């Protein structure tokens, strides 16, 4: 698979305009990226812009801190799906991961995943690895799998750092099933993206997709 097919072309700035979202969608179609990832308020716009193409629409749930209560995350997910989202990146309750509250974490993931899967959509669970040690990452991997999420994702882009090679290796150490991995946060170059793919990532989240593709052309 070519690099472009791994990229979730991302625009999550709170100041992003509708014109910028439409440009994001045009770029995604031109470069044949896997998806566009936009804020919930822009899902319907993006869905209309890429309708009839292979580009999927992704949005975020409980973003960026994961501190929404489960009922709100479920409502967010339902609205995004109704607006045309095919993929949802949900921030887990990081405080509950750190506290080891398995039932709370697994139940929340499972509830959002069930809504997604009922509509033929996928869910990626963001665990914000910058805030976790290895023990917490192992716990998060277990919860993500138990909740039947499709992906585990490193980062929101709002913490002190994005995903690292060490994070990916840690995921691979503790994931036991078919859960896929998405790397994100600070991925700005072609070499970085390719390295994460070599490590086993199935998706790359980046707002620098065009620059990464143009790097090849130059």
UniProtKB/Swiss-Prot annotation:
UniProt keyword list: Cytoplasm, Lyase, Schiff base
Cytoplasm as UniProt keyword: yes
Active-site residues per Swiss-Prot or TrEMBL entry: 89, 153, 182
Lyase found in the keyword field: yes
Domain of life: Bacteria
Alphabetical GO biological process terms: 2-deoxyribose 1-phosphate catabolic process; carbohydrate catabolic process; deoxyribonucleotide catabolic process
InterPro entries according to UniProt: Aldolase_TIM, DeoC, DeoC/FbaB/LacD_aldolase, DeoC_typeI
UniProt-recorded name of the protein: Deoxyribose-phosphate aldolase
Organism (species): Treponema pallidum (strain Nichols)
